[in-house]
C-alpha cells in the first residue's frame, strides 16, 4: 500500500480557466448546453481534469476549495480596495459553478468553503496540516502564483501551461528564484498584484523586487536597513520610503492563512473518494460530461 496522496483543487481557478478557454470569441448563445439546457463548456474541462489528476498522481484524498463571495472575504473586509477592480462574472460561468458544486456533492467529492477565508487560505491550511502530520505528498492544482509560498518537501503545485501540466516543486522554486517559498510574499509585497488590486511599492518592479529580497530576506529587514541601503539600490530609496505603508499592507494581503480552526479539526477521512466509478461516470454522463476514472481507492483511512 503506497503512501496517501492529497490533491487540493483551486475550484474556481480551474472552472474559470475552462470557461474562458472554451468560450473565447463566442457569445453565451453559442456555448454548448446539455439536454436539460444547462451550460457545460467549463464543466467539460473541470471534471475530466479532476479525474485525470486523480489517476495520474495516485490520489487517495481530494478536496475542491471554493472562494467565499468577494465582498465576504476577510481581506476585502479589512481593505475595501482588495479585488475591487474585478468585473462581474458571466452568467454562464456562474450557472456552471452552481452545477459543479451540485455534481461534486452528488458524486462524493469533498468541497470546502470556510467564510471569511478564500480558497487560497483553505488550501494553505490543508496543505500545512497534511505536511505537519506527515501524511504523504500534497499536490495543489492551480495556476495562481500566490500559492507558491506553500511549496515544501511534501507540497508541490501543478501548473497548467500550453496544454501541459508542470509539477513545480520547492527545489524548482529555489533554483528559479534563489529564495525560499516563504519569502515569496515579500517579493509580492514589493511587486503588488494588479489582478487582485494589491498596490505593492510604486516604482519597484520585477527587476528590483526579487534582488532586494534575495539580499535582505524580508521587507521587515529591508526597512530596518533602509538608511543603509546597498548603493546599487539607492535609486529606489525614496520610492521604498514613500511606499512603506503600502508594502506592509500588500504583504498582509498576499500572505496565505495556514491556521484555520475548522480545518485543524476537519476529518481527513471525509476527503477519501469512495463513490463507485460506474456511479460517477453515469452521473456525469447524464449531464453531458465524459470522464475516465481509475479504480477508486477506499482502503486508506486517516484521522
Swiss-Prot record:
Domain of life: Bacteria
Keyword Nuclease belongs to the record: yes
One term of GO molecular function: 5'-3' exonuclease activity
InterPro entries: 5-3_exonucl_a-hlix_arch_N, 5-3_exonuclease, 5-3_exonuclease_C_sf, DNA_polI_H3TH, FEN, HhH2, PIN-like_dom_sf
GO-annotated biological processes: DNA replication, Okazaki fragment processing
Keywords, comma-separated and alphabetical: DNA-binding, Exonuclease, Hydrolase, Nuclease
Residue intervals of the 5'-3' exonuclease domain: 179-262
Enzyme Commission no: 3.1.11.-
Pfam families: 5_3_exonuc, 5_3_exonuc_N
Coiled coil: none
PANTHER family documented for this protein: 5'-3' EXONUCLEASE FAMILY PROTEIN, FLAP ENDONUCLEASE XNI
Task performed by this protein: 5'-3' exonuclease acting preferentially on double-stranded DNA.
Protein name in the entry: 5'-3' exonuclease
Species of provenance: Halalkalibacterium halodurans (strain ATCC BAA-125 / DSM 18197 / FERM 7344 / JCM 9153 / C-125) (Bacillus halodurans)
Native organism taxonomy: Bacteria, Bacillati, Bacillota, Bacilli, Bacillales
